[in-house]
Regions:
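C-terminal hydrophobic structural anchor segments
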Residues: 278-325
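Well-ordered alpha-helical scaffold segments within catalytic/enzyme domains
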Residues: 18-20, 34, 74-90, 129-145, ...
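Solvent-exposed loop and edge beta-strand segments that line ligand/cofactor-binding
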Residues: 17-22, 57-74, 113-129, 170-183, ...
Length: 349
């Protein structure tokens, strides 16, 4: 509860600066560390081929077994790597690095890669997206320890990219929803990874699919959002993706057709959350954070009054989302810190 109070007091400053102080970052580090090796409760999301697949989460996934589920564990690790990189001299960075060094072993990460090779649809594509985002951050941590971790992590990146390259040509339609299966968010993350690593073949495939799925979309039905357990805005994720695909002029024209008259309707106001302890209803906290970061990303590709429309709405959503990030309930705290750090440190922008 102490952390919640501290963050609530600082919300206004976070919005004004759109950045984290070392102290604030330390609160998110503590939150991420608290779930890093927390094996239970756990939702392993496994497909059982044989009786031998019945194992504990740690046996199944020797690195990413904490934080309730695989993808949350991945972005919990990402949170630590990103904050260690942004605040290398922070007192808490020593503890965070030590925890990561215990987890990022060559043997453990190879087992993670082997699992992804065996179960090719596991965490498709939401978990894949976060795993590649972690890869971007590891590559950017340009010191001896970071290079060691990045080298050990390479097999995970390689199999995810191989799985994506095999899957995407067969995916004929986008998946439009407000939670894990949605396609616009992972396509955006994968484009960022392909550009960070220079994988032009992968980038070309991703842009082709983004154009195929979304180029012709018009008059997005904003009145249909949100659904009751969304943590994504399908419409804003799509718009945030397409700024990565189009030139600035083409993007503005497309966006004006996608959101006619740049009227955001329901998307302009934060959503309320009735129960922060309910694992599905608390998704709506993540929705507020997701709306805020996508709106900021979209605003970065616009000018003048149109830019202001998105920035004003983003501020409202940021305040609402940060207020509920530290709830004291593991239902939200096992994952919401990563969404907040993604927003507050300007990822993808």
């Amino acid at each position: 509860m102490k952390i919640f109070v501290i963050l609530s007091v600082l919300c206004a400053n976070l919005i004004a600066e759109n950045r984290l102080s070392e102290k604030q970052a330390g609160e998110f580090v503590e939150l991420a560390l608290s779930g890093l090796n927390k094996e239970f409760p756990n939702k392993p999301g496994i497909f059982l081929k044989t009786a031998e697949d019945l194992k504990t989460p740690r046996e199944i996934s020797p690195v990413f077994f904490g934080h309730f589920d695989w993808h949350s564990s991945v972005h919990g690790h990402w949170t630590l790597v990103r904050l260690v990189r942004l605040f290398p001299k922070a007192e808490w960075s020593v503890k965070a690095r030590a925890a990561l060094d215990e987890k990022f072993t060559k043997e453990g990460l190879q087992k993670e890669a082997d699992r992804l090779r065996r179960f090719k649809s596991f965490e498709r594509m939401y978990g894949w997206a976060w795993a590649l985002r972690l890869g971007i951050e590891l590559r950017a941590l340009d010191d001896e320890q970071g290079r060691k971790w990045a080298a050990a992590y390479l097999p995970v990146e390689e199999i995810i990219v191989a799985n994506a390259k095999a899957y995407l040509p067969k995916l004929d339609w986008p998946i439009r929803c407000g939670f894990h299966p949605e396609t616009a968010f992972p396509l955006g993350q994968m484009i960022d990874w392909s550009r960070a690593t220079g994988d032009e073949e992968f980038e070309k495939l991703l842009i082709v699919k983004a154009r195929q799925f979304y180029r012709g979309d018009r008059a997005y039905p904003v009145r249909y959002e949100p659904s009751g357990n969304d943590f994504f805005s399908a419409g804003l994720n799509e718009a945030d993706l397409m700024r990565r695909v189009f030139t600035k002029d083409v993007y503005r024209k497309w966006l004006g057709l996608f959101f006619p008259a740049f009227d955001l309707g329901n998307l302009s106001q934060p959503v309320s959350v009735s129960d922060l302890k309910d694992g599905h209803l608390v998704h709506l906290v993540g929705l507020n954070l997701n709306r805020a970061w996508t709106m900021r990303g979209i605003a970065g590709a616009l000018d003048g009054e149109e830019k202001e429309i998105f920035l004003v709405a983003a501020q409202k959503h940021e305040a609402a989302g940060l207020k509920d990030t530290f709830s004291g309930s593991y239902a939200g705290e096992h994952w919401l810190g990563s969404f907040a750090v993604y927003l507050l440190t300007g990822v993808g922008q």
